[in-house]
C-alpha cells in the first residue's frame, strides 16, 4: 500500500523543499520551508504565496498532504513559503506555549518577517506579488494580516475567525480559546480587546477569498459570514464559497477539486499568473 501511487508520483516534477531558519525580532529561532514550482528556473521571477498552518499546535514538515498540498499550491508558478511561527509544535513545550496570551500578534509578525527573509535571500521571488492564506488557525492569522498589513495583494481565509467573541460563543474550543486569550470573554482582557480582527474592520483593504464548510463545528459558519459581510460593507473585493456537505476539512474528492480551483483562480486573478 505504501507504494500504490509510486509510478504516478515518479512522473511528477516535485522540486526539493528548501529549509531555512532566521532569528525573529523577538530573538526566537523560526523554521521555514520554501516549495518551488515545477520547472523552476532561478533566472525567472515568481510570485510568493505565504501559506499559514492551522492549530496553532501543529507544524509544517516535509510531507504529502491532501488539504493544503504544498506542491499543488505551487504548481501554477508560485513559490510557497511555510513558516513554523511561535506556538508551533516540534520545538519543545515552552515554544508551543509562547502563543498563550499572544495568539495573533507575534505569530503574524513572524510570518511577515519570514516573507522578508525569503525575499532578501531568494532573488527569484517577486516582492511586488505576494499573497497569504491558511485554514483554521491559519485562517485566523490571515484575517489578522488583513487587520494589520497591506503588503499582500490578496488573502485566502478558510475556516478563519474574524471575531474572537462570536467564535467563543459558537465553537467547540471554548476552554482553549480562554487559555490563549488570557481569560473568558466577559473579562475583556487585553487580547480580547487588542487582537480581535473585527475591531480593525475600518482598515480592511486586501481582496480576500473566504471559504468554509457549512457543517464546521470548530470554526462555525457564522464567522465566515461575518467576515464576508464586513468585506462587502467596506467594498473590499471578496468572494465567499460555502461547501454545504463539508465540515472543518474539505475532504470529498469533487469538493477538493473545487477548493483548489477557487484558490488557484483567486491567486491568478491578483498575482497575475495564468490559472492552470
For every predicted segment, state its role.
Residues 69, 74-75, 82-276:
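Active-site-proximal cap/loop segments of hydrolase catalytic domains
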Residues 1-44, 61, 68, 75, ...:
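Non-catalytic accessory segments flanking enzyme active sites
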Residues 6-7, 28, 55-58, 124, ...:
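Active-site/binding-pocket entry motifs
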Residues 35, 51-52, 133, 211:
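Short hydrophobic segments within beta-strands
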Residues 31-33, 79, 209:
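Residues embedded in well-ordered beta-strands
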Residues 40-46, 51-92:
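Short substrate-entry loop that stabilizes the transition state in hydrolases
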Residues 17, 29, 45-46, 127, ...:
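A structure-centric signal for secondary-structure junctions around beta-strands
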Amino acid at each position: 500500500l505504501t507504494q500504490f501511487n509510486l509510478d504516478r508520483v515518479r512522473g511528477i516534477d516535485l522540486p526539493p523543499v528548501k529549509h531555512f531558519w532566521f532569528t525573529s525580532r523577538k530573538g526566537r529561532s523560526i523554521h521555514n520551508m520554501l516549495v518551488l514550482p515545477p520547472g523552476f528556473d532561478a533566472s525567472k521571477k515568481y510570485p510568493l504565496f505565504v501559506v499559514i498552518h492551522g492549530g496553532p499546535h501543529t507544524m509544517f514538515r516535509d510531507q504529502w498532504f491532501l488539504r493544503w498540498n504544498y506542491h499543488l499550491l505551487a504548481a501554477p508558478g508560485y513559490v510557497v513559503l511555510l513558516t513554523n511561527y511561535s506556538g508551533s509544535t516540534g520545538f519543545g513545550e515552552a515554544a508551543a506555549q509562547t502563543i498563550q496570551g499572544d495568539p495573533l500578534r507575534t505569530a503574524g509578525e513572524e510570518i511577515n518577517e519570514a516573507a522578508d527573509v525569503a525575499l532578501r535571500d531568494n532573488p527569484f521571488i517577486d516582492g511586488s506579488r505576494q499573497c497569504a492564506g491558511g485554514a483554521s488557525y491559519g485562517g485566523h492569522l490571515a484575517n489578522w494580516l488583513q487587520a494589520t498589513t497591506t503588503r499582500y495583494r490578496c488573502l485566502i481565509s478558510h475556516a478563519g475567525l474574524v471575531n474572537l467573541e462570536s467564535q467563543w460563543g459558537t465553537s467547540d474550543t471554548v476552554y482553549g480559546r480562554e487559555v490563549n486569550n488570557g481569560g473568558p470573554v466577559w473579562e475583556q482582557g487585553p487580547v480580547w480587546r487588542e487582537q480581535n480582527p473585527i475591531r480593525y474592520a475600518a482598515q480592511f483593504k486586501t481582496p480576500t477569498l473566504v471559504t468554509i464548510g457549512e457543517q464546521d463545528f470548530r470554526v462555525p459558519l457564522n464567522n465566515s459570514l461575518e467576515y464576508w459581510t464586513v468585506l462587502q460593507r467596506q467594498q473590499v473585493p471578496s468572494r465567499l464559497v460555502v461547501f454545504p456537505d463539508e465540515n472543518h476539512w474539505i475532504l470529498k474528492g469533487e469538493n477538493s477539486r473545487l477548493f483548489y480551483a477557487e484558490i488557484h483562480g483567486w491567486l491568478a486573478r491578483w498575482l497575475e499568473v495564468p490559472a492552470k
